[in-house]
Each structure stands twice: as C-alpha cells, then as structure tokens.
Amino acid sequence: MTQRIYLFNPDNDLALAHGGGHYIAPPFAQKMQNDLCALPMWYAEPGSLVLVSDEAMREWVDSTSERLGFTIKGITPDSLAKANDASFCPWGWSGTIKKRLIKRGVKAHLLPSDAAMEQVRLLSHRRNSIAMHHFIQERTSLPLSPVPVEYDDFNEVLDFATKHPGSYIKMPWSGSGQGVYHAIEPGTIEFERWCKGALKRQESLLCEVGLDRILDFALEFKCENGKAELLGYSVFESDFHSQYNSGIVGSKQHLYDIIASKFPPLHDITPTVTESVSHIYAANYEGFLGVDMLLYNDGGTTKLNPCVEVNLRATMGVVTCMVGEHILPKGSVGRFKIEYSKSGFHTSQENRIYLTPILPDTKYCAYIDLG
C-alpha cells in the first residue's frame, strides 16, 4: 500500500519565483522550515508519515500522535532512500523541492515529472487569478472588485499607481504578502527601482486598486482527479503589506457564520468559486489550494474581491481548517499564530496549544490561543 509522506517547505513561493531547481533558501527560511517541520501532522491523512529534521522532532511527532490517538508517524531524512512505494505531499511543489528529495535518495519515478513541475509554476502565475476573476464575474450578478491589470512596462505601472493611490503592485510569482509593493507614493526612486527590478526578473507586474478592507478570508480546497473539493473556510488578519498575521480557529460552520454575517451571499458565490478552481486549476494540478478573498467597503456597500490570490499549495488556512474541525474541543474557538522569538519560548502559557515542538534551539513556533 502506498504511504503518503508530508513535508513542510515554506519557501516554495520563493522557489517558484526563482524558477529552475537551484534555488537556495535564505537562512531564516531554512530555520523556519526546521522549527515548523511537524506542522503537516495536523492535516495529514491517517496512517501517513511527516518528514522532520531530526530524531528529537520525530519523537515529538510520534508521542503527540499517540497521545491524541492519531496514526501519524515522523520520519527523518536519512530514511527517505528506503521509501520504495511512497507518495510525497510537500507544502508546495516546485522543481526545487523535487531536486531536494532526489538529493536525499528518493527515487525519481516516485515524484512528478519535470513537465508537471513546470505546469505548476505556470499555473502559479498571478495572471491565472485574473482569468479566475473573469470566470466568476461572468457567472454572478454580485458586485465585485475591479479586475487586476498586467503590465510589462514601468511607465504603464507608474501611470496606474499614480491614478490609483494606495494601489498594490504584485510580482507574478509571489505569495503570502511577499513580492507586493503598496504604492502609497509611486513617484519615488524606491518605487521605480523595485518595479524595474521585478520587471527584469519576472517580465511583468500585476496592478490592483487599493480597497477599504473589511474582512480577509479564504476558501480552502483539495484538487484531486480533475475536481476541486471544498475543505472549508479560513478567516485571517493581514498587515498593511498584506502579509499573514494570524487566523481564527473554529469549526467549519463557525467560520462560515463569521463571513456570512458580513456577506450573506457567501452561500451563492462558494459553488461558483469551486467551479472556477476545477475549471482553471484542477485539470492540471493535484494537492491543496487556497483562494484568498476580501470583503471591502465601497461607499457604504460591502463588496467582494473574489480572488486576491490563489496559492497552489497547503496554506495556514488549511491548518486552521483541519485543527478547528477535527482537533479543537467542540464549541471552542482560538487564534492561530506563527511566532518568532530570538530568545526561545516557554511551554507553560495558559490556554495555549503548541502545534510544533519547543526545543532548546527553537526560534519559530506555531500555536493556538484558546478563548
């Protein structure tokens, strides 16, 4: 029987932006990957393995799994070469993670082809989110946000940003708030350098009008056999630059109610978004996928941005979905957060559930504060 092996590679967006398979993660990303490597155990299928960095991590996964009645086990890199009949499930796919696994002794025939990796990269380009926006717009009468525009010339980008103060300029391959410039003052040298550098590396930029934010949320999917299955909803907070801060943890119904209380047509738009994911992505992609969305105020009317970005990978929203639905005590709610501390962490925090281990050299951890 084929066994699934999950692994956490949070630098995958950066690897896709780099292209090819020779990307080397910066030290902070490597440290985050090592400290949070146990995170997939919270959404992995029963009976699966989770790749962890060392024996201490493996022992934590095994003991936590046993305590909670899971059937998840940890596996260290030196055991990968023995995986003769395994299916690999990274946080996200790219040529980089494929080469890393082969370097660790994984047989190439167990991994997606190079052509499949290139297809994932092409699907991850933000212009596909424009196609998705149009797909949804053609199938609903709901008031939606303006569709982003793609430019390959700096003067066009500058003209857009000048006409729309507070707009967001985004690199085609980026995610989680990375590769995004909030153009408050587009006439600066800094803005010009950033845009021209991005155009040189990625050939185009996507420009979006800034919106009066009410609520950030996402629909979380799993794509399999050409179809998208809705796993649930995530509600999160992002900072001024659209980077993820924290997420609400609760049941699927609780999260639905939060969104629907501000936007009753959620029930009507969800099937349309699901259809768009199946149509644009699921035919050529298998795995987790998150569609970030936004409710915003436009002259007193609540409107929807149906596709802020699409993440072809697992997301923190997938984690909060699974934990809220299957792990948290019934009726409980909490807040999920990834935190960095140079001095380390204490495990005695009241009403806090740690989702990753606290070891002597831990600098990053994932946890839920209840209540």
For each of these PLM feature ranges, what is it?
Residues 133, 161-182, 201-213, 291, ...:
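ATP-grasp fold ATP-binding core
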Residues 285-345:
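C-terminal structural cap/anchor segments
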Residues 147-148, 166-191, 217-218, 240-258:
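Glycine-rich phosphate-binding loop of ATP-grasp-fold ATP-dependent ligases
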